[in-house]
Curated annotation (Swiss-Prot):
It catalyses: Hydrolysis of proteins to small peptides in the presence of ATP and magnesium. alpha-casein is the usual test substrate. In the absence of ATP, only oligopeptides shorter than five residues are hydrolyzed (such as succinyl-Leu-Tyr-|-NHMec, and Leu-Tyr-Leu-|-Tyr-Trp, in which cleavage of the -Tyr-|-Leu- and -Tyr-|-Trp bonds also occurs). It is found in: Cytoplasm. GO terms for cellular component: cytoplasm; endopeptidase Clp complex. GO terms for molecular function: ATP-dependent peptidase activity; ATPase binding; serine-type endopeptidase activity. Its EC number is 3.4.21.92. The keyword Cytoplasm applies. GO terms for biological process: protein quality control for misfolded or incompletely synthesized proteins. Keywords: Cytoplasm, Hydrolase, Protease, Serine protease. It is an enzyme of class 3 (hydrolase). The active site is at S114, H139. PANTHER family: ATP-DEPENDENT CLP PROTEASE PROTEOLYTIC SUBUNIT (PTHR10381:SF70). This is ATP-dependent Clp protease proteolytic subunit.
Amino acid sequence: MNAGTPQHSSAWDPVGLGLIPMVVEQSGRGERSYDIYSRLLKERVVFLVGPVNDVTANLIVAQLLFLESENPDKDIYFYINSPGGSVTAGLAIYDTMQFIKPNVSTLCIGQAASMGAFLLAAGEKGKRFCLPNSRVMIHQPLGGFQGQASDIEIHAREILYLRERLNGMLAKHTGQTIEQIEKDTDRDNFMSATAAVEYGLVDKVLTSRADT
């Protein structure tokens, strides 16, 4: 998790994901084509793919709010494959997940590291999942600010504040004590899907659709 200057990136421009498949649907009004992510959004599936930054956060927040307006009583499915990124961008997603009325079910595909792991754990209790070969990693916020000594001190205090806030929220979602969270996030802490269940980051490992 990067606690420094918010990241500005063109990431989550679909072009950055390579060739995006198109889906063509037929109806009485003719044919309509969607990119695959837009089609899955109709099924209430939201993706976090790649780094967490201001661009990805804004897109995900907008999708969550849209799906709430479509049906406030139906679950949203949040698929995560992310190495993490900006703390402030991640907290924008987190706060929206907690704010909206629909339950948000989270699923790790590939990896959920740093802020990705935090968002994975923030899903609705009992509806947080990992696929069998997923990897989950937690650690403390990172900072890389440069400048005058007084400014460095200000940013150091901000990082310590964010670490305390994040540890408290992670303790709430996992059931671990804050002291245990502080110890376990002191360095990069990688977990298998099974270990993530044991730690309380997720509730179940899914091996097939029938497990949901």
